Design a protein with these regions (language model features):
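C-terminal cap/loop subdomain of S1 sulfatases and analogous C-terminal strand-loop tails that border
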Residues: 32, 39-141, 216
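A generic secondary-structure signal for well-formed alpha-helical elements
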Residues: 12, 38-43, 56-60, 89, ...
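Single, functionally critical "micro-switch" positions that shape active/binding sites
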Residues: 5, 88, 143, 147
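Substrate-binding rim/cap in mid-to-C-terminal beta-strand-loop elements of soluble/periplasmic
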Residues: 1-46, 50-63, 153
């Protein structure tokens, strides 16, 4: 759901007020190509995204087959790299940090809602499993969004979905190659804990460096 964010556009004379496009998939990398296309400016180099100018004019538009999203670290610079590739029907998530011991940290875990869930989980086994999963996630996740739009049931071990999972793994690897994603080696070595631990250690070192540089910058002000 965090990736299913509405894009609201107001363009008098072009975009029909109140019009809703609920089947088109766009992402942040598509914004620049679209603006350049509207202004008839040729991109100086190959861009990752694609223009959805035709969509704004109400014309048929063949958008991307998948949307690829990623998360690197929280606001406190705690490395929690995650990658997701999805379409309208399925979503595949790769979380190299999820080793069963490293705990997910974010502002959401300190809020009233999560604390209420933790209290209720004491006497509710279903909720207890949900809380545990939220805190530790899984190395791989796969969801059938047609049947499970809230992504509550991880199907990564379900043999009935093995063909679809294979397709999405391949699609994610391709996106990683195209974008120069630094998680590519970790993804290809996802069954090797040493490779994953080395990747997370490197990402945490990078995050710590960013945090230290930010602290020094603030102290100079």
């Amino acid at each position: 759901n965090s990736n299913k964010t509405p894009l609201i556009i107001r363009w008098p004379g072009v975009v029909t007020p109140g019009r809703i496009e609920d089947r088109a998939m766009v992402s942040a990398v598509d914004f620049l190509p679209t603006i350049l296309d509207i202004l008839s400016i040729k991109a100086p180099y190959k861009l990752d995204g694609m223009s959805y100018k035709r969509l704004l004019y109400g014309k048929k538009w063949r958008g991307p087959e998948y949307v690829y999203t990623h998360f690197t670290s929280n606001s406190g610079q705690y490395a929690e790299p995650m990658r997701c590739i999805q379409n309208h029907d399925f979503a595949y998530v790769f979380s190299p940090w999820a080793d069963g011991e490293r705990e997910f940290k974010s502002e959401t875990t300190s809020g009233l809602s999560f604390k209420a869930m933790q209290r209720a989980a004491v006497s509710d086994s279903t909720l207890a499993r949900r809380v545990h999963f939220f805190r530790y996630r899984a190395l791989e996740e796969f969801y059938d969004l047609r049947k499970d739009p809230d992504a509550l049931h991880n199907l990564i071990e379900d043999p009935d979905y093995a063909p679809q999972i294979a397709v999405f793994r391949k699609a994610m690897e391709q996106k990683m190659v195209e974008s120069g994603d630094n998680a590519l080696e970790a993804f290809r070595g996802r069954n090797d804990s040493a490779i994953l631990q080395r990747y997370i250690a490197a990402q945490q070192t990078k995050a710590d460096g960013y945090k230290e540089n930010k602290r020094k910058s603030q102290n100079k002000k």
